[in-house]
Amino acid sequence: MSQYASRSDSKGALDSSSPEAYTEDDKTEEDIPAPSNYLWLTIISCFCPAYPVNIVALVFSIMSLNSYNDGDYEGARRLGRNAKWVAIASIIIGLVIIGVSCAVHFSRNP
C-alpha cells in the first residue's frame, strides 16, 4: 500500500456534496445581504404635503428593490441611498409647508 490517497478518495473531495468543497470565500446570492431600500421611510414621506418629491423617493426605493432582485447589488445600494435622501428632503419640505400653513392660519386676526 502506498501512503498517498487513492484517486477515488481525492476525487471524492472534489465532489460538490462533500463538506470540503465549500469554503468561506465562496459567496452565493443568498450570502449577500440586501441593501436598505428605505421603503418604509418613503411610504411615511408620502403622507407629507410635498407630493412630487416623495413620489420620486418611492420610485427610487422600488428601483432599488428591483435592482437587487436583478443582481445589481451596487446599483441597489446607490438607489437605496438616493431614496433615503430624497425621502428625508420630502419630510423636511412637508414639515416646512405644514409650519408655514399653521403660522399663516393662526397669525390672522379673527
Swiss-Prot record:
UniProt keyword terms in alphabetical order: Membrane, Transmembrane, Transmembrane helix
Coiled-coil residues: none
Family as reported in the entry's similarity comment: Belongs to the CD225/Dispanin family.
Localization annotation: Membrane
Role of this protein: Probable accessory protein of voltage-gated sodium channels.
Membrane topology according to the record: Single-pass membrane protein
Cystine crosslinks: none
Disruption phenotype: Decrease in pain behaviors (paw licks and flinches) following intraplantar injection of ExTxA toxin.
Chain ranges on the Cytoplasmic side, renumbered to this chain: 1-42, 64-85
Positions with biased composition (Acidic residues): 22-32
GN (gene name): Tmem233
Stretches within the membrane that do not traverse it: 43-63
Name of the featured protein: Transmembrane protein 233
Quaternary structure (record): Interacts with the giant stinging tree toxin ExTxA (P0DQP3). Interacts with Nav1.7/SCN9A. Interacts with Nav1.1/SCN1A, Nav1.2/SCN2A, Nav1.3/SCN3A, Nav1.4/SCN4A, Nav1.5/SCN5A, and Nav1.6/SCN8A.
